[in-house]
Amino acid sequence: MSVHAIQHPLVKHKLGLMREAGISTKSFRELASEVAKLLTYEATQDLETQKTEIPGWSGEMLEVELLKGKKVTVVPILRAGLGMLDGVTDLIPSARVSVVGLYRNEETLEPVPYFEKFVGDLDERLAIVIDPMLATGGSMVATLDMLKARGCPLVKVIVLVAAPEGIARVQEAYPDVEIYTASIDERLDENGYIVPGLGDAGDKIFGTR
């Protein structure tokens, strides 16, 4: 598994703004989408293309390169992953959207599934799983379990912030999955939150804090 901590100055700047204690819901939501878009650019550099003929503006046929095959499904983990969805689909507007609903048991810190809806032909698609935080890794591994059980051959993960513990858990379960993140933070605290992290990203995106 490869872990890509993106070092682009715009990514660092926008993530830095997101860490401010008094950030508004509007600003946090906008920045989450913007960082997701920048990470998506990095994560999709190896998408396959194929040469295709199209009619050009002059009336002549042109040979261009377009994405090959069934392409991509984006998989936001509810609810916080929805805050990154627009950023991803801005770059890949033809992507189909699958949805996984998980919540964390606050005593065991393990994920509990409550909803799933996947697009068809998963065996022919790249799945991009999005969630603001990769903390313990439980929700991410549970989502990867669902995708792999349905025959999805290639999965990438995009998170705004990752903890070393979460990375290690994904790596142990699925060494073939690539992770793209704006930051690998220090650690998890006793409650399973990333330090320094972003706080509760779902609450900040939806204004329920």
Swiss-Prot record:
<feature type="binding site">
    <location>
        <position position="200"/>
    </location>
    <ligand>
        <name>5-phospho-alpha-D-ribose 1-diphosphate</name>
    </ligand>
</feature>
<dbReference type="GO" id="GO:0006223">
    <property type="term" value="P:uracil salvage"/>
</dbReference>
<dbReference type="InterPro" id="IPR005765">
    <property type="entry name" value="Ura_phspho_trans"/>
</dbReference>
<keyword id="KW-0342">GTP-binding</keyword>
<dbReference type="GO" id="GO:0044206">
    <property type="term" value="P:UMP salvage"/>
</dbReference>
<keyword id="KW-0021">Allosteric enzyme</keyword>
<dbReference type="InterPro" id="IPR050054">
    <property type="entry name" value="UPRTase/APRTase"/>
</dbReference>
<protein>
    <recommendedName>
        <fullName>Uracil phosphoribosyltransferase</fullName>
        <ecNumber>2.4.2.9</ecNumber>
    </recommendedName>
</protein>
<comment type="similarity">
    <text>Belongs to the UPRTase family.</text>
</comment>
<keyword id="KW-0547">Nucleotide-binding</keyword>
<keyword id="KW-0328">Glycosyltransferase</keyword>
<dbReference type="InterPro" id="IPR029057">
    <property type="entry name" value="PRTase-like"/>
</dbReference>
<comment type="function">
    <text>Catalyzes the conversion of uracil and 5-phospho-alpha-D-ribose 1-diphosphate (PRPP) to UMP and diphosphate.</text>
</comment>
<dbReference type="Pfam" id="PF14681">
    <property type="entry name" value="UPRTase"/>
</dbReference>
<feature type="binding site">
    <location>
        <begin position="199"/>
        <end position="201"/>
    </location>
    <ligand>
        <name>uracil</name>
    </ligand>
</feature>
<feature type="binding site">
    <location>
        <position position="194"/>
    </location>
    <ligand>
        <name>uracil</name>
    </ligand>
</feature>
<dbReference type="InterPro" id="IPR000836">
    <property type="entry name" value="PRibTrfase_dom"/>
</dbReference>
<keyword id="KW-0808">Transferase</keyword>
<dbReference type="GO" id="GO:0000287">
    <property type="term" value="F:magnesium ion binding"/>
</dbReference>
<dbReference type="GO" id="GO:0005525">
    <property type="term" value="F:GTP binding"/>
</dbReference>
<dbReference type="InterPro" id="IPR034332">
    <property type="entry name" value="Upp_B"/>
</dbReference>
<feature type="binding site">
    <location>
        <position position="79"/>
    </location>
    <ligand>
        <name>5-phospho-alpha-D-ribose 1-diphosphate</name>
    </ligand>
</feature>
<feature type="binding site">
    <location>
        <position position="104"/>
    </location>
    <ligand>
        <name>5-phospho-alpha-D-ribose 1-diphosphate</name>
    </ligand>
</feature>
<feature type="binding site">
    <location>
        <begin position="131"/>
        <end position="139"/>
    </location>
    <ligand>
        <name>5-phospho-alpha-D-ribose 1-diphosphate</name>
    </ligand>
</feature>
<comment type="pathway">
    <text>Pyrimidine metabolism; UMP biosynthesis via salvage pathway; UMP from uracil: step 1/1.</text>
</comment>
<dbReference type="GO" id="GO:0004845">
    <property type="term" value="F:uracil phosphoribosyltransferase activity"/>
</dbReference>
<keyword id="KW-0460">Magnesium</keyword>
